[in-house]
Amino acid sequence: MAVKKFKPYTPSRRFMTVADFSEITKTEPEKSLVKPLKKTGGRNNQGRITVRFRGGGHKRLYRIIDFKRWDKVGIPAKVAAIEYDPNRSARIALLHYVDGEKRYIIAPDGLQVGQQVVAGPDAPIQVGNALPLRFIPVGTVVHAVELEPKKGAKLARAAGTSAQIQGREGDYVILRLPSGELRKVHGECYATVGAVGNADHKNIVLGKAGRSRWLGRRPHVRGAAMNPVDHPHGGGEGRAPRGRPPASPWGWQTKGLKTRKRRKPSSRFIIARRKK
């Protein structure tokens, strides 16, 4: 994938960049693998805002992605197409299994149309194949990693991300996650070989406010621009200082306060915390 630039014939075009979509081979999604996606506007079932600055955006269909490839062990599939997915930063690959089933997976970097992929402990170590972590050699780059066996892929799913196998310790495999965190994950957890494709996603510049609105993002208002009733930083005459340690809209200390529970059971699996 490459990034496409524009001549600055308007102010918003000056720095705007878009993906060139050269890797996309099919424009319409597979009908059997899509379902409606209802917008919430950041509201919960009571109609109250639970996530601020969400709303609007282009209508989307949800593409059903296979994050549990262990239920097709030993069944080869051919990569039929690489498609765009509006619901994630990565591209998706349409697989045609030899038993007739079709599924979407996250498209790893280097996956080609016509290539054959397979899942299972005996699968060869090549891009797009899924195996339990204990069967993957140390140093291999993987993505779509399960945190618990049979629970579906949770880690390293965004564009350009990957985890690397650093070593083994009993039943567990030590992974370096995209954040830099070193973590133990059970060896029976499945992962897919390779890094997620569309690595240039991080170089996309929206260029104008309207493009954020197309994505369903509303303006992010600073607390200092609000009234005192709306935010701890609000109020004052003109540009007033905060007058207190920085706080969230709900009064929690922010800017550096650790929010992870001290006695969280999964902490025993974290060898080294993420890099700041």
UniProtKB/Swiss-Prot annotation:
Keyword set, alphabetical order: Ribonucleoprotein, Ribosomal protein, RNA-binding, rRNA-binding
Chain segments annotated as coiled-coil in the UniProt record: none
Residue segments, region Disordered: 223-276
Stretches with biased composition (Basic residues): 257-276
Compositionally biased intervals (Basic and acidic residues): 230-240
InterPro entries according to UniProt: NA-bd_OB-fold (IPR012340), Rib_uL2_dom2 (IPR014722), Ribosomal_uL2 (IPR002171), Ribosomal_uL2_bac/org-type (IPR005880), Ribosomal_uL2_C (IPR022669), Ribosomal_uL2_CS (IPR022671), Ribosomal_uL2_dom3 (IPR014726), Ribosomal_uL2_RNA-bd_dom (IPR022666)
GO BP terms in the entry: cytoplasmic translation
GO cellular component, one term: large ribosomal subunit
Pfam families: Ribosomal_L2, Ribosomal_L2_C
Subunit structure: Part of the 50S ribosomal subunit. Forms a bridge to the 30S subunit in the 70S ribosome.
Protein family membership: Belongs to the universal ribosomal protein uL2 family.
Name listed for the protein in its UniProt record: Large ribosomal subunit protein uL2
Gene source species: Thermus thermophilus (strain ATCC BAA-163 / DSM 7039 / HB27)
Lineage summary: Bacteria, Thermotogati, Deinococcota, Deinococci, Thermales
GN (gene name): rplB
